[in-house]
Amino acid sequence: MYPEYQNIFTQVQVRGTPEMGMDDAGNNMMEERVGKPFFSTLAGLFGNGQIGPYYFGWTSIVAFGTGIAWFVIVGFNMLAQVGWSIPQFIRQLFWLALEPPSPEYGLSMPPLNDGGWYIIASFFLLVSVMTWLLRAYLLAEQHKMGKHIFWGFAAAVWLFLVLGLFRPILMGSWSEAVPYGIFPHLDWTTAFSIRYGNLYYNPFHCLSIVFLYGSVLLFCMHGGTILAVTRYGGDRELEQIYDRGTATERAALFWRWTMGFNATMEGIHRWAWWFAVLTPITGGIGILLTGTVVDNWFIWAQEHHFAPMYDGSYGYEDYGSYEAFIGKEN
């Protein structure tokens, strides 16, 4: 009887000697690994049950240190907004925010309580994110891997930099940056779209949504395909890439019969990687052009025959009466 996955959890957990990872004599990577490895049944339901050891390089220490500094600054500013009341902090957490400076300060350093804390927190967050990006590159170098994970994370960092650094500088004011808060940053997104004539008419926003939904579709198609042929060894994808077996043949046949085309066992990962990477890249381009090049995306879309031109009234007054507008005039 072939093993078969019947739910999203791993049903059989195999445990042996903890895997310590590779070590090159010249790198002394083992010296920087911390924590005694152990196994977690809960973690094993979702992936590999082994926890640790963790590789603590200098980039990890800097990233964690500055990230915690950002978290503490934002948290204490939110706590101060509710009079240092823990119950109110918990109650209003979703609505609290550390806001960027007001427009009158431009790109200067404002007083702490007028946006200065926001600038300081943003500095620590920038250092944390960029150091973590460097960590991804250095770890790939040490393991002699490709840089695909680094470039994938770099695409997300591009959007992060556009929102909090590049665009505010081009606009000449830190007030253009995104506030730190759960609902407030969503409110900022809505107001940003309304302010510039609806981002739906931004072609790069359109592309970003295409790649976002496309990534979800590809992930679902690939994940479903592999689970469907796991009983034939389809989960051993590396083997199937260089030595195609019955799992690959069955999966390829299924998709050829479904839509007339099938990706390869290697190619589907390139499709998924590019779709995922292009989501923040195109989104970042669209955000960077907003306000700097295009003031109103709806008018821009009309001028480029992307949106309809509305001439005159198009409310119920144009129909003579409200009843005629809703089609109930006698």
Swiss-Prot record:
Gene Ontology BP, a term: photosynthetic electron transport in photosystem II
One Gene Ontology molecular-function label: bacteriochlorophyll binding
Binding site for Fe cation: 222, 237, 269
Cysteines paired by S-S bonds: none
SUPFAM superfamilies (alphabetical): Bacterial photosystem II reaction centre, L and M subunits (SSF81483)
Localization per record: Cellular chromatophore membrane
List of residues binding a ubiquinone: 255
Function: The reaction center is a membrane-bound complex that mediates the initial photochemical event in the electron transfer process of photosynthesis.
Name of the featured protein: Reaction center protein M chain
